[in-house]
Curated annotation (Swiss-Prot):
Lineage of producing organism: Bacteria, Pseudomonadati, Pseudomonadota, Betaproteobacteria, Burkholderiales
Organism: Burkholderia cenocepacia (strain HI2424)
GO molecular function, one term: structural constituent of ribosome
Name of the protein in its database record: Large ribosomal subunit protein uL3
Chain intervals with Polar residues compositional bias: 134-146
Positions of the UniProt region annotated as Disordered: 134-154
Length: 217
């Protein structure tokens, strides 16, 4: 599914109340300053997409090729460039320098949010994969928190790829699907999304219309 989305910054979590008095946990996303830097078409690039910039960056921190690319679009340099695949009809409605705001979505709409999870450092299998620990006593002397067997003997004589073992936990790209937009603050350019979103405060996230919801926009 090809849909235009937004780049945002995770502000943090809070709660809001409905008209019925129900408390809803929400994650606040700052989606300000999404500006179009390039419109890609089938004729020039082989596919249709829109490239947007988010945030700000000092001119001294921008490479000359990128500075020329942004100057051509008449857009200020940003922290990040993100490309969204869209259809030709939607691309025709946009132009370089156009601002894509929070009004791209509507309250109640389902969205997918992608971010980088918080890094936890080196972790064992109990913390990393929720393995069970061994017995504390009754003959168990040195195998309380070990993962157990990681393979067989001479045949096949190796550890299979993908075996869950100790290692770095977190700091991976995670996509949470079908989150609901609880509220939109168009004036402050904020999206309030129901539930938790991967990543630390200040982390960059990508918000797109849900792809697995019936009738998703």
């Amino acid at each position: 599914m090809m849909s235009l989305g937004l780049v945002g910054r995770k502000v943090g979590m809070t709660r809001i109340f409905t008209a019925e008095g129900d408390s809803i946990p929400v994650t606040v996303l700052d989606v300000s300053d999404n500006r179009v830097t390039q419109i890609k078409t089938v004729e020039t690039d082989g596919y249709t997409a829109v490239q947007v910039a988010f945030g700000s960056r000092r001119a001294s921190r921008v490479t000359k090729p990128l500075a020329g690319h942004l100057a051509k679009a008449g857009v200020e340099a940003g922290e990040i460039l993100k490309e969204f695949r869209i259809d030709a009809a939607k691309a025709a409605e946009l132009s370089n320098g156009a601002v894509v705001g929070a009004d791209l979505f509507e309250v109640g709409q389902k969205v997918d949010v992608q971010g980088v999870s918080i890094g936890k450092g080196y972790a064992g299998t109990i913390k990393r994969y929720n393995f069970s620990s061994g017995r504390a006593t009754h003959g168990n002397s040195r195998s309380h928190n070990v993962p157990g067997s990681i393979g067989m003997a001479q045949d096949p004589g190796r550890v299979f790829p993908g075996k869950r073992m100790t290692g770095h936990m977190g700091d991976v790209t995670v996509t949470v699907q079908n989150l609901e937009i609880a509220r939109i603050d168009a004036e402050r350019k904020l999206l309030l999304v129901k539930g938790a979103i991967p990543g630390a405060k200040g982390g960059k996230v990508f918000v797109t219309p849900a792809v697995k919801t019936k009738g998703a926009k």
